[in-house]
Curated annotation (Swiss-Prot):
Keyword Flavoprotein appears in the UniProt entry: no
Native species: Protochlamydia amoebophila (strain UWE25)
Organism ancestry: Bacteria, Pseudomonadati, Chlamydiota, Chlamydiia, Parachlamydiales
Function: This protein is located at the 30S-50S ribosomal subunit interface and may play a role in the structure and function of the aminoacyl-tRNA binding site.
GO cellular component, one term: cytosolic large ribosomal subunit
Domain of life per record: Bacteria
PANTHER family: LARGE RIBOSOMAL SUBUNIT PROTEIN BL19M (PTHR15680:SF9), RIBOSOMAL PROTEIN L19 (PTHR15680)
Matches recorded under HAMAP family: Ribosomal_bL19 (MF_00402)
Name of the encoding gene: rplS
Keyword field: Ribonucleoprotein, Ribosomal protein
The keyword Ribosomal protein appears for this protein: yes
Protein name in the entry: Large ribosomal subunit protein bL19
PROSITE patterns in UniProt: RIBOSOMAL_L19
Family annotation (Pfam families): Ribosomal_L19 (PF01245)
Amino acid sequence: MIMSRSAIIEKLQNEQMKKDITPFRIGDTVRVHIRIIEGDKERTQVFAGTVIARKGQGLSETFSVHRVAYGEGMERVFMLHSPRIAKIEVIKEGDVRRSKLYYLRGTSGKASKVKARLGARRSSNAVTKQIVSAE
């Protein structure tokens, strides 16, 4: 069976894509655990902030996380399927009406807050349903 070049590339990309990615949206506050290798040592560094953008699709999908530390705005772009990302934790789910939150770059203090989504935390909601159905 002869496969086309694009079919071969797609197959290779699907093999390299992570399957266990935590679902998150724009506006969510996340904690990204990154593996850092220095010589023969490996450690995990945590970067927490608000997701302000998601771009691309497939293996080349990226997301940007913005945070303010010591009065300075910091932004970092991560490859979603990178082997360097150990895990992504969703701390708080945000309710926004934009697909890109670049306006947060120039804000500080209360102006940089994102409204919390009502009825959020899907995982805790599932636990509540199990408790209610058990009674």
